[in-house]
Amino acid sequence: MSTSETATVIPVYDVAPGQQGAPAVDRAPAPSAPPAAAAAPAAAAAKSTAPRRFAAGRFFRQSDRGSRCLAFLDFLLRIAAFGPALAAAIATGTSDETLSVFTEFFQFRARFDDFPAFLFLMVANAIAAGYLVLSLPFSAVVVLRPQATGLRLLLLVCDTIMIGLLTAAAAAAAAIVELAHNGNERANWVAICMQFHGFCQRTSGAVVASFLSVFLFLLLVVLAAFAIRKR
């Protein structure tokens, strides 16, 4: 007995899926990261950079504040150094003294310009006092603009020159003052301060004031070097 079977024909296509005539193929969508998970690293990065930026800004503000304080101290020291320099120049220039012996026709006179060291001392202190007055506007600019490193460097160089000038003048005058007070027996130089008290007092005070100005200039140089190093 024969039976008839129905054959099932399965069509086979040679075309790739997705082309025209090919059966549609369902594809699963690609997995995507959740919005919350994607936004979490960005938020964390923003939180981590915000304190850094705030700390950096605070550091620069503190640095400018410290530089401004140093510049203001520099301004005050220049005013303080002006007094001793001017006093030394005036004391030396007005140290002349006349000593009368027996009559007015026999007089001994001590003048500062008879000693080159005292003349040098007066000129050096006058130059230093004038320089300090001229440097005050530049120092004020540095107070208002702490980042002006060029002005600090210029003042540092000029202050160093003033230190050398005043030190040389004060040292030379100190040697003459010591000789005027004590004399020199080997050279047969007699001490004159026993007779010319006013002359010796004024010149001695001028020497002390000059060394005080040198000390204040040294402080100015140290402050300027420290401020430039911070920059």
Curated annotation (Swiss-Prot):
<feature type="topological domain" description="Extracellular">
    <location>
        <begin position="174"/>
        <end position="207"/>
    </location>
</feature>
<feature type="topological domain" description="Cytoplasmic">
    <location>
        <begin position="139"/>
        <end position="152"/>
    </location>
</feature>
<keyword id="KW-1003">Cell membrane</keyword>
<keyword id="KW-0472">Membrane</keyword>
<keyword id="KW-1133">Transmembrane helix</keyword>
<feature type="topological domain" description="Cytoplasmic">
    <location>
        <begin position="229"/>
        <end position="231"/>
    </location>
</feature>
<feature type="topological domain" description="Cytoplasmic">
    <location>
        <begin position="1"/>
        <end position="69"/>
    </location>
</feature>
<dbReference type="GO" id="GO:0007043">
    <property type="term" value="P:cell-cell junction assembly"/>
</dbReference>
<comment type="similarity">
    <text>Belongs to the Casparian strip membrane proteins (CASP) family.</text>
</comment>
<feature type="topological domain" description="Extracellular">
    <location>
        <begin position="91"/>
        <end position="117"/>
    </location>
</feature>
<dbReference type="InterPro" id="IPR006702">
    <property type="entry name" value="CASP_dom"/>
</dbReference>
<dbReference type="GO" id="GO:0005886">
    <property type="term" value="C:plasma membrane"/>
</dbReference>
<feature type="transmembrane region" description="Helical">
    <location>
        <begin position="208"/>
        <end position="228"/>
    </location>
</feature>
<feature type="transmembrane region" description="Helical">
    <location>
        <begin position="118"/>
        <end position="138"/>
    </location>
</feature>
<comment type="subunit">
    <text>Homodimer and heterodimers.</text>
</comment>
<feature type="transmembrane region" description="Helical">
    <location>
        <begin position="153"/>
        <end position="173"/>
    </location>
</feature>
<protein>
    <recommendedName>
        <fullName>Casparian strip membrane protein 1</fullName>
    </recommendedName>
</protein>
<dbReference type="InterPro" id="IPR006459">
    <property type="entry name" value="CASP/CASPL"/>
</dbReference>
<dbReference type="GO" id="GO:0042545">
    <property type="term" value="P:cell wall modification"/>
</dbReference>
<feature type="transmembrane region" description="Helical">
    <location>
        <begin position="70"/>
        <end position="90"/>
    </location>
</feature>
<keyword id="KW-0961">Cell wall biogenesis/degradation</keyword>
<dbReference type="Pfam" id="PF04535">
    <property type="entry name" value="CASP_dom"/>
</dbReference>
<dbReference type="InterPro" id="IPR044173">
    <property type="entry name" value="CASPL"/>
</dbReference>
<keyword id="KW-0812">Transmembrane</keyword>
<comment type="function">
    <text>Regulates membrane-cell wall junctions and localized cell wall deposition. Required for establishment of the Casparian strip membrane domain (CSD) and the subsequent formation of Casparian strips, a cell wall modification of the root endodermis that determines an apoplastic barrier between the intraorganismal apoplasm and the extraorganismal apoplasm and prevents lateral diffusion.</text>
</comment>
<dbReference type="GO" id="GO:0048226">
    <property type="term" value="C:Casparian strip"/>
</dbReference>
